[in-house]
Amino acid sequence: MNKRKNIYFLLLLALSLANIVAQYISGSSIQSRLFNSDALYLPTLFADILSNNGQINEWFLTPAPYFFPDYPMFLLAYLAGPTPYSQIIAFALIQTALTFFAIWLIARVTINVNSFITASTALVILIWLALSAREPFALILNSAHHYGAFLSSILLLALWIKFNNEGQIQRKIIFLFLIAIIAYATALSDNFFLLQFVAPLIATQAFISMAERDFAFKNKIPLIILAICSLLGSISYKWVVENQTRYPTNIGIDKLSSNLKDIYELLQSATIGNPLFGFIFLLYVGIVLYSLTKIIRGEKESAKLYWLAIFSFLSLCATLGAVSLVTNLSIESRYLIPALSWPVIVVLIFLSYRLRDRFFYLAIAISLLTLASMSCSSHHSIISNGINKQYYPEEISCIDNALEKENLHNGIAQYWDAKYFQNFSRLNLNIAQHSDNLGEIHWITSKKYFKQAYDFAIISENAAPPDKISSEALTRINGSPKFVETCGRKLVFMYGKDKMRVRKIVAVGDSYTWKACELPTRIGEKTADCGIKKKDGTQSGYLTFGPYDQLHTGQYTFEIAYSSAASKGKTAGDWDVVLALPKEAKVLNNGLITGTEGATEKIVGIFALDSGQDLEKIEIRTLARPNVDLTVICLRIDRVQ
């Protein structure tokens, strides 16, 4: 009988997975979430390394590099699918299937009743929530969005419970070794793991120890080993990752009220916006309170179930508490994955244990209702959009045709377009990420994509600064493009093979002139002819600085055109040429700015960059002295060697 029931739920599970595929290939709203630039991190990385001879040490990885479990899962997806389009859906199915396995395992080690039915029902609900395009539930389909750390947490929790209830010493050692390895790999991959798993596990064990009056040190050794391995994993990031992008997390109460408001809105959207999940969440709160009283009273029956409820609640509290105190990051739904996913798992495991055989009828009713809802949405999406076995929008086709005609392959685009076009083009394109002022964006990309010269630029007409690449900046450096192709909302500026520069000065003989009003200022204001003059003659400070352009090793000359009403020979200010280094500027040359009696004159100087200073940012500063008139007109830099 149980085998037949499991077959029913296996069928329901398969139909739920089929709905994921149906909505994906019919272009539903989940597709846009899977195709944004952040979500295309692993497809781009794996294609570069496995197909284009790329090296991982050339990459600027995500701040949480997601080595485990995301990399092994995506490797399977990469081997299973010939294109990024098929690899993305393959990954979604693999991650969803592993979530089922993890839930099944934790149900088996806690209650060992209806484990398959419980895991199937939980996953059907989670898939339904995901396909309703509600975050963070939709992230079960995404790679590299913190879901992998949550998946590891479920698996590790099941192994931890199994370890604590294992009688054989050899098996306990094997389980502890496996736990330590997974904890190390996950902490190396995502610091969020420490918050959602390690901290609440320590707190749960401490609470249980106090409730049971168990203060023996030897019983704490496995927990200490797990904590040490997790911390070592987190610390190892600085030795493992070549180009580090992990940023510090600032904690304080400065944004507490706004953070709490954002968290409240996310919770309200998840619960009030979805009555079924809202009801599950209310049941979850009741289960946590019930479990808390049972543990305090020292009841041993169902202890593992109560322990699971307390752990999940402490994980929820740790997540929400820490996120509410962060001052340098915005509140994103992906930070609430454990807080909103654990209630579904815990409630179904608890109901399965309490209802026993009757749980089958509740589970099949819930599964059929949610499956019917998913199937209706999938049918509507297929009727509206059709089925696309390949993803090749007209906009990308238009761009490909234009580039293929001119035999162009190396180009630039804004951050949100670069990986998208590179992945879904039928051409072997190399597209580097650049900002509006043509600066390189070293964020989730490879160093090898950036070139001294390119062939084309893709400009999004509907993008806003600082994302939209400036056509004016391109034409000032390179002149008018050879061809311009309009493809939907994109403009393709085609200059020809290696005919387009983004750096103003690259080769010997290159020069560039900045009007003073294009440079930053502290005490100046713009003049009618785009110069910069002092707002207040009594002030002193930087009249102009910048331009922060990266220059290659070589020798350069510069000219600062300026005027001052001060008499000749009188000092009106100071100038210097510096490397804009992260901690402090390094002065390469400096001198005085003298009066010109109102005439326009030039300061001419030289500077050189050695091999250790290649591509450092250069800044040429003018510092006005008090009670002296000074106007900067323009700045010119020439590469002479």
PLM feature spans:
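Signature aromatic-anchored transmembrane alpha helix within multi-pass, membrane-resident enzymes
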Residues: 5-16, 173-179, 224-228, 283, ...
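Extracytoplasmic loop-helix module adjacent to an early transmembrane segment
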Residues: 12-56, 74-79
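Transmembrane-helix motifs of polytopic, lipid-linked glycan transferases
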Residues: 13, 90-117, 155-158
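Short hydrophobic/aromatic helix or loop-helix immediately within or flanking a transmembrane segment
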Residues: 38-48, 60-83, 258-268
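Membrane-interface micro-motifs in multi-pass membrane enzymes
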Residues: 67, 113-164, 331-343, 415-416
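Hydrophobic/aromatic-rich transmembrane helices and adjacent perimembrane loops
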Residues: 144-152, 195, 275-286, 304-356
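Hydrophobic, aromatic-rich transmembrane alpha-helices
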Residues: 202-213, 277-302
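Short periplasmic/luminal acceptor-recognition loop of GT-C membrane glycosyltransferases, typified by
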Residues: 405-439, 565
